[in-house]
């Protein structure tokens, strides 16, 4: 899996770049924010690689928070790379975290390809979206980390939230409590 690339920009469009890495030129899809942030010929990008039956796609980001935002929205059922990139082009990670925290459907509907149903689903799925290790409004950092840890173990977000409701403590305590309660469910 490719997680980063450094090379010389051969061509730059608003939604993709051609990056020459040691003589091999890759087409990398980028958000408009990333495209605007590329000022130098030599650039280092954080990469998300999406492998499909018919394509091997690379998505590049200058900012790790933008990459995290993209990776997070891709996990939502019905949200593909095209919509994920549109979200990254429309919002900065900080703005997106505020939109999610305030559950602002109308702001999310501004993104091309997102209607009212999809916007509502995204807001429900991303209730605990975190930027820069700080939790979005209404969620402590330890709670957000515990939720992510339990999700990485394969538990569903709604079950995790039920299990962790009323719990407090540091991340490891919350994970232990969550595991105990999730085993009973």
UniProtKB/Swiss-Prot annotation:
Principal subcellular localisation of the protein: cytoplasm
Region Domain I, annotated ranges: 1-62
GO biological process, one term: DNA recombination
Keyword NADP recorded: no
Similarity field: Belongs to the RuvA family.
Domain of life (superkingdom): Bacteria
Gene3D superfamilies, alphabetized: 5' to 3' exonuclease, C-terminal subdomain (1.10.150.20), Nucleic acid-binding proteins (2.40.50.140)
Protein name per Swiss-Prot or TrEMBL: Holliday junction branch migration complex subunit RuvA
Taxonomic lineage of the native organism: Bacteria, Pseudomonadati, Campylobacterota, Epsilonproteobacteria, Campylobacterales
Stored SUPFAM superfamilies: DNA helicase RuvA subunit, C-terminal domain, Nucleic acid-binding proteins, RuvA domain 2-like
SMART domains: HhH1
Biological role: The RuvA-RuvB-RuvC complex processes Holliday junction (HJ) DNA during genetic recombination and DNA repair, while the RuvA-RuvB complex plays an important role in the rescue of blocked DNA replication forks via replication fork reversal (RFR). RuvA specifically binds to HJ cruciform DNA, conferring on it an open structure. The RuvB hexamer acts as an ATP-dependent pump, pulling dsDNA into and through the RuvAB complex. HJ branch migration allows RuvC to scan DNA until it finds its consensus sequence, where it cleaves and resolves the cruciform DNA.
Domain notes: Has three domains with a flexible linker between the domains II and III and assumes an 'L' shape. Domain III is highly mobile and contacts RuvB.
Assembly mode: Homotetramer. Forms an RuvA(8)-RuvB(12)-Holliday junction (HJ) complex. HJ DNA is sandwiched between 2 RuvA tetramers; dsDNA enters through RuvA and exits via RuvB. An RuvB hexamer assembles on each DNA strand where it exits the tetramer. Each RuvB hexamer is contacted by two RuvA subunits (via domain III) on 2 adjacent RuvB subunits; this complex drives branch migration. In the full resolvosome a probable DNA-RuvA(4)-RuvB(12)-RuvC(2) complex forms which resolves the HJ.
Alphabetical keyword list: Cytoplasm, DNA damage, DNA recombination, DNA repair, DNA-binding
Gene: ruvA
Record Pfam families: HHH_5, RuvA_C, RuvA_N
Region (Domain III): 139-185
Compartments (UniProt record): Cytoplasm
Region spans: Domain II: 63-139
Record-level GO cellular component terms: cytoplasm; Holliday junction helicase complex; Holliday junction resolvase complex
Location of region: Flexible linker: 139
Molecular function GO terms recorded: ATP binding; four-way junction DNA binding; four-way junction helicase activity
């Amino acid at each position: 899996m490719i997680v980063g690339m450094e090379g010389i920009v051969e061509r730059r469009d608003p939604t993709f770049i051609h990056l020459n890495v040691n003589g091999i030129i890759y087409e990398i899809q980028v958000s408009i924010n990333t495209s605007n942030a590329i000022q130098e010929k030599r650039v280092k990008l954080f990469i998300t690689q999406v492998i499909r039956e018919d394509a091997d796609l690379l998505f590049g980001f200058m900012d790790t928070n933008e990459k995290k935002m993209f990776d997070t929205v891709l996990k939502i059922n019905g949200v593909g790379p095209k919509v994920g990139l549109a979200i990254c082009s429309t919002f900065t990670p900080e703005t997106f975290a505020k939109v999610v925290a305030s559950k602002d459907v109308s702001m999310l509907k501004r993104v091309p390809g997102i209607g009212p149903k999809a916007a509502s689903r995204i807001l429900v799925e991303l209730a605990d979206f975190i930027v820069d290790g700080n939790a979005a409004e209404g969620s402590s950092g330890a709670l957000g980390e515990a939720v992510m840890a339990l999700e990485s173990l394969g538990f569903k977000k709604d079950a995790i939230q039920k299990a962790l409701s009323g719990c407090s403590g540091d991340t490891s305590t919350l994970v232990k409590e969550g595991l105990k309660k999730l085993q009973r469910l």
